[in-house]
Amino acid sequence: MARACRERAVLRWAAVALVVVTAQMFVPGAHAADPADIAEGMRLFRQKGNCQVCHGWAGDGRKMDSQMPDGANLRESMLDRETLITIIKCGRPGTGMPAYDKFAYSDGRCYGLKQADLKSPTRQMPDPPATLQVREIEAIADFMFAKIIGKGTMDREKCVDYWGSDVELCSELAK
């Protein structure tokens, strides 16, 4: 009898675990990122995408170039992964956020708009520093969810986690 109860309990826990794992596959933003993807995403955020110029190195909206538009404070963002990827691919017409998908407005894939629709002064967008492939956009999203999105104000502990060591920038932040 006790053995049968234990077996049922084990089966129940296994069923619950299966449901949780399966549900995570369908929840927006629930994505287990590989550490190598996170590192590559950070490199792309800082270099090829040059996201830090508008959003700041910490993603807090403190831009690094006064000539660039103000970027959103991503540390306080509540975006899900799918929406973030769409914004990186398609930009945000009428704002300073460029579209990193080379074909974003060639066929209506972004917000149902085409290149001709962006000629209106209220929908104009800057050109990105470079276009990105889907895998690169996904790596940036992985990095942002691991180190920036929803992480709150940058402090020394988060800075060390962000860089992987106690770099000089971190010493300027409160503990």
Explain the meaning of each model-derived region.
Residues 1-11:
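N-terminal secretory signal peptides that target proteins for export/translocation
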Residues 13-25:
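Bacterial N-terminal signal peptides
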Residues 26-32:
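Sec/Tat signal peptide C-region and signal peptidase I cleavage site
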Residues 33-39, 47-49, 95-175:
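Flexible coil segments in periplasmic/lumen-exposed cytochrome c-class electron-transfer proteins
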Residues 40-42, 60:
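Residues within alpha-helical segments
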Residues 53:
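Short, cysteine/histidine-rich loop/knuckle motifs that typically chelate Zn2+
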Residues 57-119:
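Gly/Gly-Pro-rich "capping" loops immediately C-terminal to redox-active cysteine motifs
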